[in-house]
Structure formats: C-alpha cells, structure tokens
C-alpha cells in the first residue's frame, strides 16, 4: 500500500483547499494511505477527501492536540515543526500544494531523502515535478513510490508477515 504525504499551508486559499480535497479523494480511490501534518488548510482538505472516500488518513501533529476531524490515526509528537521530518520520512512520495516556509522545509527534507516530490502550484525548486491537475499528481506519486517497507496492511485471508 502506497503512503503519500500531502503537504501545504494550514491557511490554504480556497483554490488550494479544493485542490487538496481532490488529491485526498484520489489517493483513497487508488488505495493509498494519506500522511500529513494533521492540522487545518491543505492537510484538513486532503484528509476530508480521503476520509469521505473511505481512505485511511494519518496525521503527525506538531503538539499534543487531536488534529483535524478527518484523521483516522493521530500521532502526537510535541515536536513543533520538527514533525515535518516524520511526515516526509513516513511517505513513499510527497505531493505539495501551495504552501509557505513550512511546506518549503518539507520539500527540502523530501528531496534530501530522495523522496519523489510532485507539486501543484507550489515552490519552483529543482527536483519538484510540476503537475497541472490533482489526477496528474496522484498518478505520478503512485507510480513513483516504491512499495513501503515501513507499513503493511494485511488483507483478509493473508498470513501475517
């Protein structure tokens, strides 16, 4: 199962919110797990899209709070922006939507870790693959992501690892 991180600003514009909602829905449709920073804006919209479609959402939150209401799993870190490393490290691929300096830090970490990064109206940086639509970004992320050795969901009838 592919784990895709969706990163972007907590104070998303209406266009970024709509884009993130579509990205989350498409991740769920493609049986991916959505990883994010667990807060509002882009993160909340992506989680809502995935959750509404029956997908699994994981929020790695910066404090001891509960994150947004569309999270299936909440990981409380108490690390502040340091949790950005965990968000990116947990993912097989990253989709950046808009964003400010927090998003920039996550992109830099992802590139340093050789994670594939796909951007929708985000920072113009070498290594970030520009995508025009949510469909394009999710399809590219799913294709680029290697199978995750960090996480496995057992299917009905499948033997434990």
Regions found by a protein language model. Give the residues of each.
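Glycine-rich beta-alpha loop segments
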Residues: 1-58
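Glycine-rich oxoanion-binding loops at beta->alpha junctions
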Residues: 60-90
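Short glycine-/acidic-enriched loop or helix-start segments at secondary-structure transitions
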Residues: 16, 45-47, 69, 105-107, ...
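Short, ordered loop/turn segments at secondary-structure junctions
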Residues: 39-40, 62-65, 122-125
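C-terminal binding/interaction regions
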Residues: 8-11, 80-147
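Short Gly/Ser/Thr- and charged-rich N-terminal loops/segments
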Residues: 154-157
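Short hydrophobic/aromatic-enriched beta-strand-loop microsegments
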Residues: 53-62, 75-76, 117-120
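Short, well-ordered alpha-helix to beta-strand connector turns
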Residues: 31, 71-72, 91, 114
């Amino acid at each position: 199962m592919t784990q895709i991180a969706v990163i972007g600003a907590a104070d998303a514009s209406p266009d970024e919110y709509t884009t993130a909602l579509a990205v989350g829905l498409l991740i769920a449709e493609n049986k991916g797990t959505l990883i994010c920073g667990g807060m509002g804006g882009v993160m909340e919209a992506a989680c809502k899209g995935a959750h509404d479609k029956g997908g699994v959402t994981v929020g790695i939150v910066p404090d001891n709070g509960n994150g947004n209401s569309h999270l299936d799993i909440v990981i409380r870190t108490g690390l502040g922006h340091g949790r950005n490393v965990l968000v990116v490290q947990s993912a097989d691929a990253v989709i950046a939507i808009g964003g400010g300096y927090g998003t920039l830090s996550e992109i830099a970490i992802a590139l340093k870790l050789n994670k594939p990064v796909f951007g929708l109206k985000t920072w113009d940086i070498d290594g970030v693959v520009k995508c025009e639509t949510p469909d394009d970004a999710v399809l590219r992320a799913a294709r680029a992501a290697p199978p995750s050795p960090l996480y496995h969901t057992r299917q009905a009838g499948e033997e434990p690892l």
